[in-house]
């Protein structure tokens, strides 16, 4: 297995943000652009764990695929992923950047995580077991784990700092944060993106149970930013093995989450080391996601 990229170091560029997975660099002389670099770091429960070799390239490949497929719904921040077209300051790092980076427009990120759910799973399922009113949605009684909702639902959350937890908020609270008109626009865009992607993925044998979009503003216009519909930001299930009433076979981080849940770990840093077997099997799930969805 190839060596993983856990950290980045590009002295001629200016690191402006290091997230759970991505590092964002400003480029001297190009104030309207940023370089987004996907490392191989992997996180769960808002804790950075370790690295999955090649993961950053998988996330980048999928994001580029979805940016293209969804471009007629909303513009996105991508300028190019061809390292030969990057500004000159990036040239010394071309080999490190190839396949895992995107030159993007600098935007003002909206302070909302745009989550769309087509199926009941994960934390939403756990909350439903306690109360059928979840995130402001009154759901019918008697739903099973992994059941499909009649229509996709939009459940926003706050955007927490690294190490903190995102907090689910009501649509009304979101309206207070961004304004009524903008909130309606964000929800409409998010659901349209999910519906298009879910319909496409189903033709490839993949169910997108839920996903998280990030939106930003540039010149007063809302655009799609960050990563899009990857195994880090989504739940991907095998359509041919879908069976409501239980958790599903997936091509995402759920295998890793399940492993961590089996440990005596309080889900706070420091994270336990990941055995090689867990790293290899997680990588295999990510590989299958990109192969099924893109055909490559």
Curated annotation (Swiss-Prot):
The protein's enzyme class? ligase
Question: What does the record give as the reaction this protein catalyses?
Answer: 5-amino-1-(5-phospho-D-ribosyl)imidazole-4-carboxylate + L-aspartate + ATP = (2S)-2-[5-amino-1-(5-phospho-beta-D-ribosyl)imidazole-4-carboxamido]succinate + ADP + phosphate + 2 H(+)
UniProt keyword terms in alphabetical order: ATP-binding, Ligase, Nucleotide-binding, Purine biosynthesis
Superkingdom of this protein's organism? Bacteria
- Tell me the Gene Ontology biological-process terms attached to this UniProt entry: 'de novo' IMP biosynthetic process
Pfam family membership, one: SAICAR_synt
CC terms in the record's Gene Ontology section: cytoplasm
| EC number, as in UniProt | 6.3.2.6
Q: Does the keyword ATP-binding apply?
A: yes
- Please name the SUPFAM superfamilies in this protein's record: SAICAR synthase-like
ATP-binding among keywords: yes
The protein's annotated pathway: Purine metabolism; IMP biosynthesis via de novo pathway; 5-amino-1-(5-phospho-D-ribosyl)imidazole-4-carboxamide from 5-amino-1-(5-phospho-D-ribosyl)imidazole-4-carboxylate: step 1/2
One GO MF term attached to the UniProt entry: phosphoribosylaminoimidazolesuccinocarboxamide synthase activity
**HAMAP family listed in its UniProt record:** SAICAR_synth
PANTHER family assigned: PHOSPHORIBOSYLAMINOIMIDAZOLE-SUCCINOCARBOXAMIDE SYNTHASE (PTHR43700:SF1)
* Stated family: Belongs to the SAICAR synthetase family.
Q: What is this protein called?
A: Phosphoribosylaminoimidazole-succinocarboxamide synthase
Organism of provenance: Desulfotalea psychrophila (strain LSv54 / DSM 12343)
């Amino acid at each position: 297995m190839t060596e993983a990229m856990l950290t980045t170091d590009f002295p001629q560029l200016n690191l402006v943000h290091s997230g759970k997975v991505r590092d964002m660099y400003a480029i001297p002389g190009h104030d309207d652009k940023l370089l987004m670099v996907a490392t191989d770091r992997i996180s769960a429960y808002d804790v950075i764990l370790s690295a999955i070799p090649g993961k950053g390239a998988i996330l980048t490949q999928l994001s580029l695929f979805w940016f293209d497929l969804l471009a007629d719904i909303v513009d996105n921040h991508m300028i190019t992923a061809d390292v030969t077209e990057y500004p000159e300051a990036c040239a010394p790092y071309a080999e490190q950047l190839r396949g895992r980076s995107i030159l993007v427009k600098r935007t003002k990120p909206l302070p909302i995580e745009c989550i769309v759910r087509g199926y009941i799973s994960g934390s939403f399922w756990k909350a439903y077991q306690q109360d059928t009113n979840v995130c402001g949605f009154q759901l019918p009684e008697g739903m099973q784990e992994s059941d499909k909702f009649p229509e996709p639902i939009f459940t926003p959350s706050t955007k927490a700092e690294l190490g903190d937890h995102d907090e689910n908020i009501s649509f009304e609270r979101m309206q207070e944060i961004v304004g009524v008109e903008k909130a309606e626009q964000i929800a409409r865009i998010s659901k349209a993106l999910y519906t298009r992607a879910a319909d496409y993925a189903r033709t490839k044998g993949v169910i997108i149970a839920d996903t998280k979009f990030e939106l930003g503003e540039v010149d007063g216009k809302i655009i799609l930013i960050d990563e899009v519909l990857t195994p880090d930001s989504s739940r991907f299930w095998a359509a041919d093995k879908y069976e409501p009433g239980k958790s599903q076979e997936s091509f995402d981080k759920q295998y890793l989450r399940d492993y961590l849940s089996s440990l005596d770990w309080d889900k706070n840093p420091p994270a336990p080391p990941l055995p090689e077997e867990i790293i290899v099997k997680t990588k295999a799930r990510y590989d299958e996601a990109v192969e099924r969805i893109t055909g490559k």
